[in-house]
């Protein structure tokens, strides 16, 4: 699909990618998957994503490596951290650094759904504000 909500999934854990794909199935979503920070960076250079779902730790870095770049290149992109350690300090740190949402692993379909709803609402609100400016 090429005209759905553009989403970047950055995950080295197959179970997280499978859960995200299960939730996305049948929705108007154009998803791209990366398992490494360098792959995600290439994707971010070629496309503006509405949402980035990123695991806290990847094979070649962490979500923080991408979050700073997303904020610089595409400040309107919503960034969702998938927290697999379950440590409260990590959760607070991700929010402090600019993530809009933090989902705990194992991912729950309703949590992913809510993150998508928030992204869609945010996109609609930004378009409406731009139209009235």
What are these regions (language model features)?
Residues 13-33:
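Two-component/phosphorelay signaling modules centered on CheY-like receiver
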Residues 64-76:
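Short amphipathic alpha-helix used as the core "switch/output" element in two-component signaling
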Residues 107-116:
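C-terminal output helix
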Residues 35-51, 55, 59:
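Acidic, metal-coordinating helix/loop segments flanking the phosphotransfer/catalytic sites
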């Amino acid at each position: 699909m090429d005209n759905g909500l553009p989403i970047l999934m950055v995950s080295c854990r197959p179970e997280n990618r499978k859960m995200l794909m299960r939730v996305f199935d049948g929705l108007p979503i154009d998803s791209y998957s990366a398992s490494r920070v360098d792959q995600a960076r290439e994707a971010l250079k070629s496309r503006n994503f509405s949402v980035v779902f990123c695991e806290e730790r990847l094979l070649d870095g962490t979500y923080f490596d991408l979050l700073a770049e997303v904020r610089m290149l595409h400040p309107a992109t919503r960034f969702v951290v998938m927290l697999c350690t379950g440590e409260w300090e990590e959760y607070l740190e991700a929010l402090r650094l600019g993530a809009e949402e933090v989902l705990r692993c194992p991912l729950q379909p309703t949590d992913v759904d809510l993150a998508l709803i928030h992204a869609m609402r945010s996109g609609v609100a930004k378009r409406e504000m731009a139209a009235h400016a």
